[in-house]
Amino acid sequence: MTVALLKTAAEPATTAATSDSTAANESSPTGDVTSVPAIADAGISADVINGGRRLFGKQLALAASALAVAGWLPQRQAWAAGSDKPEKTRVQVGFIPLTDCASVIVASQMGFDKKYGIEIVPNKEASWAAVRDKLVNGELDAAHVLYGLVYGVHLGIGGSKKDMAVLMNLNHNGQAITLSNQLNEQGVRDGESLAKHIQKNPREYTFAQTFPTGTHAMWLYYYLASIGVHPFQDVKTIVVPPPQMVANMRVGNMDGFCVGEPWNARAIFDKIGFTLATSQDIWTDHPEKVLGCTAAFVQQHPNTARALTAALLEASRFIDDPRNRATVAKLIAGKAYVNAPAEVIESRFLGQYDNGIGRRWQDPNYMKFYNDGQVTFPYLSDGMWFLTQHRRWGLLSSEPDYLSVASQINQIAIYKQAAAAAKVPVPSDVLRSSKLIDGKIWDGKEPARYAASFSLNSAQGVAA
């Protein structure tokens, strides 16, 4: 099984999107595709842009002023001295320019970090591979990161093994699969018509995701399989960093991609693609990004880990208040963060969906950050689900000890301490049950059996 890595290099502006449609300082696509091992390094060579504290000053000042008047800004420091004092007070937190990085930015810029005696320094990264590498080598203390990436590193899938930790879940929902307008012009409107088109018009169809073990890869594979398309036999899969998806579709490097917002909405805004399916269509209230770090960071800085989690819990609660959504969209839209028009971020951030080919709807299952603590709790069943899909698609050559691995990674004890400090309710069970797009029920109770239940798979020894 192979995927392809889309290489990038500096190129004339005529072959790539303009600076206002992709993240600042990103390389332009070349279209040069190379086959690589399935879990090869999924990154690109690029300088990391440090989001730091640079922001579009007037907007932030006005937003902060309004929030202070409304009584939203933190008024006191919760942990500043004694045995609870954070061991490390300046915390480097990585993020990728996606809408769901919002809790990191809000915690930093709205002062929720100060309440818990720390300073969050957001670091904007160029690719998920860069996030992985900097977490592992200690350049980043923690990061907004793909759930499945953390589990892959912990198990050494495709690279060096490093014990990892998930402090909390950051969001549910809010990703999507986008197809090119060329497919729409050829009659593709939905999953059924896509499957028929691929069968009747044989050629090399190329779909992009953002990291081989990550969430976008798993949503893409799961959706394609649900319509009878094998993601490794019937189509070609490549890896592209999120901010470069739109530029690469524009120059014809792919037929479709799976990524987080706002890049699906941006493809529609730029009139180059349409939304085939949202990730909440695949799994309503699915886990997505997490606050991830190494196990060593938690062991060496338990108070800092707890303070960081508490700060992001408060930020998550703030974001989920409908009164704050438009303000947050403007806050994260700047070049230091997502680097996209605020209106492109805001529409789907508010659940206002337009698929680009005539359908508009208000989605009740839009991107959520809190939902009374249901979003943020690190359910063991959520982590185990990604392991079942890694097994299904041959990324794991043998069955892991699902529950043991999830229990090692997901830091439920620290989460509960942070939740108590932030006055966030905690679910009573570490497992939850969900029904996915193909009708299968996932409850975390028989993971090996679940992993083996899929007729479309790439794993040796796995058969439905």
Across the structure, where does each feature detected by a protein language model lie?
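Ligand-binding pocket segment of bilobal, Venus flytrap-like solute-binding proteins
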Residues: 140-142, 240-275, 294, 326, ...
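N-terminal secretory signal peptides
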Residues: 1-55, 76-79
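Secondary-structure end/capping motifs
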Residues: 300-411
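Conserved C-terminal helix/tail region of periplasmic/extracytoplasmic solute-binding proteins
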Residues: 384-464
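N-terminal export leaders
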Residues: 53-70
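Short, glycine-/small- and polar/acidic-enriched structural segments
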Residues: 80-239, 251-268, 272-285, 435-455
